[in-house]
């Protein structure tokens, strides 16, 4: 059972109950906290477009705790982040794996973060093909083109060579927050303020 917390705000006009995600959206915060599929992508894209329409100058904050998911759904989010005018700050909490790590790197340069104990995992796209030989060949060619595109974009976003990206994504490659910074996937590890 998936419980979504409710926040109650009191104003001079009375009380109003929000689900937590709607309340965070008021502060320009979007939470990607699940596997990425078409429904999740449509929700994230809609929120990005809404926040741009509300104020095209203020930054948007995308918090990521995701195991990854659909490449095409992830590209929908990635392209929207690149398309809209406001800078999108990306913050990894917990884990940004696979397409989650790709979206973490998609944030505005200088505004990509991870919390100290967060993990990042990069790898090549996964695919499965079945059917006749020609169908398998078509699927294999498609996944190779997708891998080339992902590697090229990751190279641009991290400053690593395409050859290094190919080698490092050949298998699941887990990075600490500090290693993700050294690799160029993020710009800073967020250190908690002393209390």
UniProtKB/Swiss-Prot annotation:
A single GO CC term, please? endopeptidase Clp complex
Q: Could you identify this protein by its name? A: ATP-dependent Clp protease proteolytic subunit
Quaternary context: Fourteen ClpP subunits assemble into 2 heptameric rings which stack back to back to give a disk-like structure with a central cavity, resembling the structure of eukaryotic proteasomes.
State the family named in the UniProt similarity comment for this chain: Belongs to the peptidase S14 family.
Provide the reaction this enzyme catalyses.
Answer: Hydrolysis of proteins to small peptides in the presence of ATP and magnesium. alpha-casein is the usual test substrate. In the absence of ATP, only oligopeptides shorter than five residues are hydrolyzed (such as succinyl-Leu-Tyr-|-NHMec, and Leu-Tyr-Leu-|-Tyr-Trp, in which cleavage of the -Tyr-|-Leu- and -Tyr-|-Trp bonds also occurs)
Describe the task this protein carries out: Cleaves peptides in various proteins in a process that requires ATP hydrolysis. Has a chymotrypsin-like activity. Plays a major role in the degradation of misfolded proteins.
Active-site residues, as the UniProt record annotates them = 98 (nucleophile), 123
